[in-house]
Amino acid sequence: MRVSSHNSGGKRAAVLLALALLVPGCSVLSGGGPPPTFDLSAPEQFPRASRAPRAQLIVQDATAVGVLDSDKIVVRPAEGKIAALADAQWSERLTRLVQVRAIQAFENAKRMRAVGRPGDRIVADYQLLLDIRSFEIVVEGLSAEVTIAAKIVGDRSGRIVAGRVFTARVPASATQGPPAIAALDEAWGKVASDIVLWASTVI
């Protein structure tokens, strides 16, 4: 349900309702069965590459700390505070979802000779390391924010070839339920697309 930007009373009411549905950090929803689960999508539309794919890439397991390394959907009700939605969760640990959807994004872009995860039968030229810094709904201002630090490492040398921090913020029409997840998915899609395009110019 969308909250109009000019309706400040309705917007405040929506925020207050959403805050009532939050649980602190790592608390667990009690009763009523498991909450509905949500997934992330992989970007599909990319500009045509200017050269033929030449590198093979392994995307390592993404890393994160605290509640981000779980299936909880994070909300930031105020600066310095985090909570988790009580009425929703990711279909898997967020770190796993990010790795899988990042691989799919690279496959969709067709900018690598091959891309996979550790254990796949790929003779990798490079590894991509992803560290999730933020992946949350920000209550103040109603927005979704995703920040991921990416590093490209030479598979044989073990040296960092390049590194960059990617951030996307998009408006959210609500702080919980499908509208909040849609905003997070859009922000993630922007970051994932930027990572793919950046990596394809570096290697």
Language model region names:
Residues M1-C26:
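Sec-dependent bacterial lipoprotein signal peptides
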Residues C26-T95, A124, V202-I203:
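A structural "domain/chain start" motif
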Residues K81-Q89, R156-S193, L197:
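Short secondary-structure boundary motifs at beta->alpha junctions and helix caps
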Residues N7-S8, L197-I203:
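Generic C-terminal helix-cap and adjacent flexible tail
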Residues A62, I132-F135, T167-A168:
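Generic short beta-strand segments
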Residues S27-R48, P53, Q104, N108-R159, ...:
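Surface-exposed short loop/turn segments
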Residues T95, Q99, I103, A109, ...:
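Extracytoplasmic/secreted envelope proteins and their assembly/folding machinery
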